[in-house]
Structures are given as structure tokens and as C-alpha cells.
Regions:
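All-alpha helical catalytic cores of prenyl diphosphate-utilizing isoprenoid enzymes
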Residues: 40-53, 63-77, 93-96, 100-101, ...
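Short acidic/histidine-centered micro-motifs embedded in hydrophobic/aromatic stretches
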Residues: 113, 152-156, 309-313
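Acidic, Mg2+-coordinating active-site segments of isoprenoid diphosphate-utilizing enzymes
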Residues: 105-130, 135, 187-194, 206-277
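N-terminal domain-start signal
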Residues: 2-115
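Primarily interfacial, aromatic-capped hydrophobic alpha-helices that serve as membrane anchors
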Residues: 137-155, 159-164, 241-304
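Short hairpin/turn module used for nucleic-acid contact or packing/dimerization
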Residues: 96, 100, 291-324
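Short, charged, amphipathic alpha-helical segments
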Residues: 122-126, 148, 202, 280, ...
Length: 324
């Protein structure tokens, strides 16, 4: 879930989703989700809350949201389904899903040291978990859903992020990514189980989340290789390609703000070319997952989500046809 700087002139942009043209209502929802996170922040002690609000405000700032627009970092429909499912249009439900999305990102950035684990950062994580527990408990009671469903989703997420098993191939790599998306599929599953949404939403969000991981890996080949991360692309390389990838890694994986690893030899076009076939296969897998998500949305009659998914997939297909 990494952001990327604009490419230099003449350099192809990294692989990515097509830019979804949001309706005004969906854009308003996106900005509202940032406000739901600030509701959670407001529960923190004031000195910590001020620091966290300032930190969040620096992420995803836009012309129309000078206090921050955090969820521009998350592509639709991983959050926009809240607009398309009528039962999800409620402040408490929006806050629950905003907390679930941010928790995954927060944990990810804590793990890779993009965030300094100071008191404010750790307190927000605590408050996000508390929000998740309280709001899901209320929904389970209101909708007659077994609270064990929530426990199973949180356990899947924590097991997959705290001590993930070592994958054996791309299939098992994707399986782990599905487990790590368990917080994001929690609300869709509650909506389905509580009879508030047709079946298929949780699988749709899960397929999209895995596709996002694959597209992100395809965009971060250079960074992952020099950091010693065996991403999805690594699993699609030949034995010689994997050996070259591993040779690039450094024990500490320290990077500067440009993504360069200190002490690493320059990564030139030949290295990109050697990874191109693997990148193409990873993007093809992502496109297939998005196609499956399109089918689920179409079966549910959700034309708005179909449009979002087709637009996202078009960007992936364009990336897959482009030389790297």
C-alpha cells in the first residue's frame, strides 16, 4: 500500500489501477470517512490527539479537504461499497469500516518502520481496535449475528500479519493476502450474515484486496528487491531471476526518501527487463481477480461497482501490455 512519486519525464509510470471517476456522492463519502477517523482520534488524550490529527492530515491532502483526505490512499471499491449498499449508509458503520481500513495500513507502516511507534501512534492503534470491537458488538446485537464471526475475522488478520506462514508459491502468497484482508471483509460479511446485503460482497472486497496487493507488488519491484522482500513478483521469476533478486537485498533494508537503498548498486533498465515477465504474470493474476469481482458485482446488479472495477482493471491491463 505504498504511495509513489510522479515518474520522471520519459519514464513509464508504475503499474496501477485505472483512475475511477467518482460520483459526487462517492467523493463525499470518501471525505466523510476521514472525519469518522477523526471521531476516533477525538477519544484520545488531547496532546496525543493533536499529534495524530496532524499526522493524518498530512496524508492524502487535497484541494477540497485541507484537513486531510486519508482515503484517497485506498482505491474504490474497498470503501465505496458503503455508498452502494443502502444498509451501510450509517455513521457508526462508516466509522467501523474506516477504522478497519486504517488499522491494516497503520499496522503495515508500523511493521515496515514508516511510522515511529511513539505514544500517539500506538494510542491511535488502541483506539481503532476499541472502535472496531464496540461497533461490531453493537451490529451483532442489532442484526442477530453471532459475535464469533468477528472473533474469527480478527484472529485471521492477526495471525496472518503477526506471524505469517512462509508461502510456497504465488497461490499460497495470495492466500496469505486474503487472510490479511480479513479486517476489510469483516463489515461486508456482517452485512451479508445479518441479511442487510446480498451474498458476494465480502468475496468481492477480498478479491479486490488481493488484486491491490499484486498491483502494488508489480509497482514496487525495485524497492522490494533491494529491501529483500520476496513479493509476488519474486514467485513468478525463474530460479536465476530469484537468485539475482535475493542478491540485491541488504540486511538492514534502509532506504532514503527516494526509495534508494544505501550502498546498493544502481538498478538499471536491464534489471527491470529481467523482471518484466514476472511482473506481467502478476498483473495477469490481478486482472483475473478483478474480472471475478466484476462478475460478482454484475450478479448482484451493482452497476456502479461494476464501473469502478472495470475502470480499475483497464489500468491493470494497460500496465500488463506495457514494456518495463
Amino acid at each position: 500500500m505504498s504511495g509513489t512519486l510522479p515518474p520522471a519525464s520519459g519514464v513509464p509510470s508504475p503499474p496501477g489501477f485505472g483512475a475511477v471517476l467518482e460520483t459526487p456522492e462517492v467523493s463525499a463519502l470518501r471525505r466523510r470517512l476521514h472525519g469518522r477517523v477523526l471521531e476516533v482520534v477525538s477519544r484520545m488524550p488531547r496532546p496525543l490527539a493533536e499529534d495524530v490529527a496532524a499526522l493524518l492530515g498530512r496524508h492524502g491532502r487535497t484541494r477540497t479537504a485541507d484537513q486531510g483526505d486519508l482515503f484517497v490512499l485506498f482505491p474504490a471499491p474497498v470503501w465505496s461499497f458503503l455508498h452502494w449498499v443502502p444498509a451501510a449508509r450509517h455513521p457508526d458503520i462508516e466509522r467501523l469500516h474506516a477504522a478497519a481500513l486504517l488499522l491494516h495500513l497503520w499496522d503495515d507502516h508500523l511493521t515496515d518502520r514508516q511510522l515511529v511507534p511513539d505514544l500517539a501512534v500506538l494510542q491511535l492503534r488502541t483506539e481503532l481496535w476499541r472502535c472496531l470491537e464496540q461497533d461490531t458488538s453493537a451490529l451483532c446485537a442489532a442484526w442477530g449475528v453471532d459475535p464469533g464471526l468477528v472473533a474469527r475475522h480478527t484472529e485471521r488478520y492477526l495471525c496472518a500479519t503477526h506471524a505469517p506462514r512462509t508461502p510456497a508459491d504465488l497461490d499460497s502468497y495470495c492466500s496469505i493476502a486474503r487472510e490479511q484482508a480479513a479486517l476489510w471483509t469483516l463489515l461486508p460479511r456482517l452485512l451479508e450474515t445479518g441479511g442487510r446485503a446480498v451474498a458476494g460482497w465480502s468475496s468481492l472486497v477480498e478479491d479486490f484486496a488481493v488484486a491491490w496487493r499484486l498491483v502494488d507488488d508489480a509497482a514496487d519491484v525495485r524497492r522490494d528487491a533491494v529491501a529483500g522482500i520476496r513479493s509476488a513478483v519474486w514467485w513468478e521469476l525463474s530460479g536465476a531471476g530469484r537468485a539475482r533478486w535475493d542478491a540485491w537485498s541488504r540486511p538492514d533494508g534502509r532506504t532514503d526518501t527516494s526509495g534508494d537503498v544505501h550502498g546498493a548498486a544502481p538498478w538499471d533498465g536491464s534489471e527491470d527487463a529481467r523482471c518484466a515477465e514476472g511482473v506481467g504474470r502478476v498483473l495477469a493474476r490481478a486482472a483475473a481477480l478483478l474480472a471475478a469481482a466484476v462478475d460478482r458485482a454484475a450478479a448482484a446488479g451493482e452497476e456502479g461497482v461494476v464501473t469502478e472495477l472495470l475502470t480499475a482493471r483497464a489500468g491493470v491491463l494497460t500496465s500488463a501490455r506495457r514494456p518495463f
